[in-house]
């Protein structure tokens, strides 16, 4: 369990926790949506923090709401090192209650990419990467690339 290994826990410092923090994000943040989730984000120089809103309208049973939050926390925990700084608040929609865990995680990743919070994945093309040549290393008769 997470309690036995504290390094695997989702740290409190990476959470949006107070009502005032949520209000700031909802009032000043940008928003993007997906059929399962809605993301409110506010970029900043602070480390990335996650907040979640999963109401009883999404799922009347606590076990269902907690499953959604657990999936989002786990995805965020793995993404923390590469995520851009700022506050991210996820609002679950009612369709999330019927979605599988991978569907929820994928929707979260799509929203983060759309918000520009994650670096774009490298294209899996067949072309080798372009060779970069500094202009000062070229001889006067050699054309630039």
UniProtKB/Swiss-Prot annotation:
InterPro entries: Ribosomal_Su5_D2-typ_SF (IPR020568), Ribsml_uS5_D2-typ_fold_subgr (IPR014721), RNase_P (IPR000100), RNase_P_CS (IPR020539). Gene3D superfamilies: 3.30.230.10. It is an enzyme of class 3 (hydrolase). Signal peptide: none annotated. GO terms for cellular component: ribonuclease P complex. Belongs to the RnpA family. RNaseP catalyzes the removal of the 5'-leader sequence from pre-tRNA to produce the mature 5'-terminus. It can also cleave other RNA substrates such as 4.5S RNA. The protein component plays an auxiliary but essential role in vivo by binding to the 5'-leader sequence and broadening the substrate specificity of the ribozyme. This is Ribonuclease P protein component.
């Amino acid at each position: 369990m997470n309690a036995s290994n504290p390094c695997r826990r989702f740290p409190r410092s990476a959470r949006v926790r107070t009502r005032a923090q949520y209000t700031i994000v909802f009032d000043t943040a940008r928003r993007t949506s997906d059929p399962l989730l809605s993301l409110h984000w506010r970029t900043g120089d602070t480390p990335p923090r996650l907040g979640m809103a999963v109401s009883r309208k999404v799922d009347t049973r606590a076990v269902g709401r907690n499953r959604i939050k657990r999936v989002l926390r786990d995805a965020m925990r793995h993404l923390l090192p590469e995520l851009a700084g700022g506050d991210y608040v996820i609002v679950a929609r009612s369709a999330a209650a019927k979605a599988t865990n991978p569907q929820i995680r994928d929707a979260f990743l799509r929203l983060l990419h759309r918000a520009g919070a994650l670096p774009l994945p490298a294209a899996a093309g067949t072309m080798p990467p372009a060779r970069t040549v500094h202009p000062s290393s070229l001889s006067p008769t050699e054309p630039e690339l």
